[in-house]
């Protein structure tokens, strides 16, 4: 069978070692004669899975002791609502800053309008025709706000903010759905981090939340219990039946990451993959990327061709070559290669070779 590399923005490629182990264990997990999908989430066996997953994630990100880790439902969009409902309290006139650099940050700000009057800050700018993000020192924040929300990596436009926040006592909330575990971060600089699993963590269906303990217990009275961080903490993320298989697979990914050398090693690999792909894009006139180098994403690399009429042919030929899901988002068009942790260097090398051949034949 032809080697297939999945460049989808999410659900994304999973480590092949994890998939093979899951295949081996699928019908007889730990000698129990049943699948992990069929056991009680409150039984001793699965509680051990949950405990190990939490500890492994804590180890990988060096999560401080005064932060709680939750495994939730609802994806990042669920957190778009959960964040204001948990952090704004009962005062409906409370304000929150939303730094908007792309589609997902804008979506979070739009959802927040249901619960407050968010202060949206446009941090995107064009410099010499290239999309870039304003430095954090230039963000026009309110003097008093309940929190600052931003998205460090925007998957559609392929922009990243590597600068870590330094806003004193201000509560910083980050949507790290597409960048978590791809590089080291200082968790103590954030009040709350959330991430949908389907890019760098595991399969779709589970969402990570890392929340500082002093932010618990602030939720509005009318918040749905399933979104209340305090309720989830008190129930060990099992207020209702959790997505156990996604939790189990995410835990396996955490163990795989530790075996590979942790997030520092992932950062090294991801930089190497991104450098190779951007060099291929910048190396001629056939392809282009419209993001300023300082803000180019290492996770999601969009690019266009000199003649957009060739796009469908590129997608089709790439798929036949085992390079799947390279069609750009409908908002941006063109091509997009998502190269998360599980994408091996060989996958990017195969893509770069295909791009060179395609340009030679159609340039």
Curated annotation (Swiss-Prot):
CC per GO annotation? cytoplasm
Q: Which PROSITE patterns does the record match to this protein?
A: AA_TRANSFER_CLASS_5
UniProt remark on cofactor binding: Binds 1 pyridoxal phosphate per subunit.
Q: Which UniProt keywords apply?
A: Amino-acid biosynthesis, Aminotransferase, Cytoplasm, Pyridoxal phosphate, Pyridoxine biosynthesis, Serine biosynthesis, Transferase
Query: Which Gene3D superfamilies does the record associate with it?
Result: Aspartate Aminotransferase, domain 1, Type I PLP-dependent aspartate aminotransferase-like (Major domain)
Pathway per its UniProt entry is:
Amino-acid biosynthesis; L-serine biosynthesis; L-serine from 3-phospho-D-glycerate: step 2/3; Cofactor biosynthesis; pyridoxine 5'-phosphate biosynthesis; pyridoxine 5'-phosphate from D-erythrose 4-phosphate: step 3/5
Q: What is its EC number?
A: 2.6.1.52
Give compartment(s). Cytoplasm
Q: Which reaction does it catalyse?
A: O-phospho-L-serine + 2-oxoglutarate = 3-phosphooxypyruvate + L-glutamate; 4-(phosphooxy)-L-threonine + 2-oxoglutarate = (R)-3-hydroxy-2-oxo-4-phosphooxybutanoate + L-glutamate
Q: Which InterPro entries match?
A: Aminotrans_V_dom, Aminotrans_V_PyrdxlP_BS, Pser_aminoTfrase, PyrdxlP-dep_Trfase, PyrdxlP-dep_Trfase_major, PyrdxlP-dep_Trfase_small
Report the CDD domains cross-referenced here: PSAT_like
As cofactor, the record names: pyridoxal 5'-phosphate
The GO molecular function terms of this record are: O-phospho-L-serine:2-oxoglutarate aminotransferase activity; pyridoxal phosphate binding
- Return one Gene Ontology term, BP aspect: L-serine biosynthetic process
Q: Which residues bind L-glutamate?
A: 42
Q: Which PANTHER family is this protein grouped with?
A: PHOSPHOSERINE AMINOTRANSFERASE (PTHR43247:SF1)
- Please name the NCBIfam families in this protein's record: PRK05355.1 (NF003764), serC_1 (TIGR01364)
Q: What does this protein do?
A: Catalyzes the reversible conversion of 3-phosphohydroxypyruvate to phosphoserine and of 3-hydroxy-2-oxo-4-phosphonooxybutanoate to phosphohydroxythreonine.
**Its family?**
Belongs to the class-V pyridoxal-phosphate-dependent aminotransferase family. SerC subfamily.
Task: Give the quaternary structure.
Answer: Homodimer.
What name appears for this protein in its UniProt entry?
Phosphoserine aminotransferase
Organism this protein belongs to: Edwardsiella ictaluri (strain 93-146)
């Amino acid at each position: 069978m032809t080697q297939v590399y999945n460049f989808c923005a999410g659900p994304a490629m999973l480590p092949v070692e994890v998939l093979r182990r899951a295949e081996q264990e699928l019908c007889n997990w730990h000698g129990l004669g049943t699948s992990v999908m069929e056991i009680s989430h409150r039984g001793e066996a699965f509680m051990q899975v949950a405990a190990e997953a939490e500890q492994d994630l804590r180890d990988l990100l060096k999560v401080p002791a005064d932060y709680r880790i939750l495994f939730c439902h609802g994806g990042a969009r669920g957190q778009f609502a959960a964040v204001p409902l948990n952090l704004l309290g009962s005062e409906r006139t409370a304000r929150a800053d939303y730094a908007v650099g792309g589609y997902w940050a804008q979506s979070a700000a739009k959802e927040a309008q249901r619960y407050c009057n968010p202060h949206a800050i446009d941090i995107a700018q064009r410099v010499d025709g290239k999309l870039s993000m304003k430095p954090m020192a230039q963000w026009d924040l309110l003097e008093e706000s309940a929190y600052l929300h931003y998205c460090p990596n925007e998957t559609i436009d392929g922009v990243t903010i590597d600068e870590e926040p330094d806003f004193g006592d201000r509560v910083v909330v980050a949507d790290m759905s597409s960048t978590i575990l791809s590089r080291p971060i200082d968790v103590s600089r954030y009040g709350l981090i959330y991430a949908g699993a389907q890019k760098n963590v595991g399969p779709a269906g589970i969402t990570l939340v890392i929340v500082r303990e002093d932010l618990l217990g602030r939720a509005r009275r009318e918040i749905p219990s399933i979104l209340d961080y305090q309720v989830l903490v008190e129930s060990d993320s099992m207020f209702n039946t959790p997505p156990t298989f996604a939790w189990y697979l995410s835990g396996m990914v955490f163990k795989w990451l530790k075996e590979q050398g942790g997030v520092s090693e992932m950062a090294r690999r991801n930089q190497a993959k991104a450098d190779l792909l951007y060099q291929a894009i910048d190396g001629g006139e056939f392809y282009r990327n419209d993001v300023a180098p300082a803000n180019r994403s290492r996770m999601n690399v969009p690019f266009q061709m000199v003649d957009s009429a060739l796009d469908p042919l590129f997608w089709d030929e790439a798929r036949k070559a085992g390079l799947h899901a390279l069609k750009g988002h409908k908002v941006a068009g063109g091509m997009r290669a998502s190269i998360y942790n599980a994408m091996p260097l060989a996958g990017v090398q195969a893509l770069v070779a295909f791009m060179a051949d395609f340009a030679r034949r159609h340039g």
